[in-house]
A protein has these predicted regions:
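Short secondary-structure boundary motifs at beta->alpha junctions and helix caps
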Residues: 72-87, 147-190, 198
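Mid-chain, structured segments of secreted extracytoplasmic proteins
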Residues: 79-107, 118
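Surface-exposed short loop/turn segments
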Residues: 29-41, 104-171, 175
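Sec-dependent bacterial lipoprotein signal peptides
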Residues: 1-28
Length: 201
């Protein structure tokens, strides 16, 4: 009886794998992004560099009013939809990406007079056969005691070889798109004007 039970389990597992692959190929999968986590690269930027970054608070992040609400809700990769696990919003995913980096570095302080807010300006990904492309842009604003000290739009992009098979191309494109959030936060931390605005006092 045991060998038959094992064989049956293997068959079920095989069918489950085939169905998962088929769903990607057929274009009917919902693909949630992974929750934001601190990165070694951004942690190094927060702890090093000059001037040193002081404690900050992360305020509201919203979608640009000129954009359709759908831009904040999902991106399509060969008819599969990538969605944010943070309130179903890419603007909130960007906020959380920044927040967890600051928290991990011990720089998040709700009482700080330096507040970072953001506006999601662009969010896109394309994964045709050939070259895949993704882009993410946002405007970041730093206020200190109510006075604007920094206001700048930043953008990051990615391109990669996109294969024919959806079972490979779709997760690859989703990973490239998700990585842009960490890269955009990294670009913010590299900006000398931003560092000056949130410098330790």
């Amino acid at each position: 009886m045991t060998p038959r039970s094992t064989d049956s389990g293997m068959v079920r597992a095989l069918w489950a794998a085939l169905l998962a692959a088929a769903s990607l190929l057929a274009g009917c999968a919902e693909m949630p992004m992974t929750p934001p986590k601190p990165t070694i690269e951004n942690a190094a930027k927060l702890r090093a560099g000059s001037p040193a970054i002081g404690p900050v608070e992360v305020g509201k992040f919203t979608l640009d009013a000129a954009q359709s609400a759908s831009v904040d809700k999902g991106v399509s990769i060969r008819s599969n939809t990538v969605r944010s696990p943070v309130e179903g919003s890419f603007a909130q995913y960007l906020r959380e990406t920044l927040r967890v980096e600051l928290q991990s570095a011990g720089l998040l302080d709700a009482r700080s007079d330096a507040v970072i807010t953001g506006t999601l300006l662009d969010s896109s990904v394309e994964a045709p056969v050939g070259t895949g492309k993704a882009a993410l842009a946002a405007r970041f604003v730093v206020t200190r005691s109510g006075t604007v000290r920094y206001d700048r739009a930043l953008r990051t992009e990615a391109s990669w070889d996109s294969p024919f098979m959806g079972v490979s191309a779709i997760p690859q494109a989703a990973g490239q798109y998700e990585a842009l959030y960490r890269k955009l936060v990294g670009a913010l931390l590299d900006d000398a004007a931003f560092r000056a605005a949130v410098a330790r006092q």
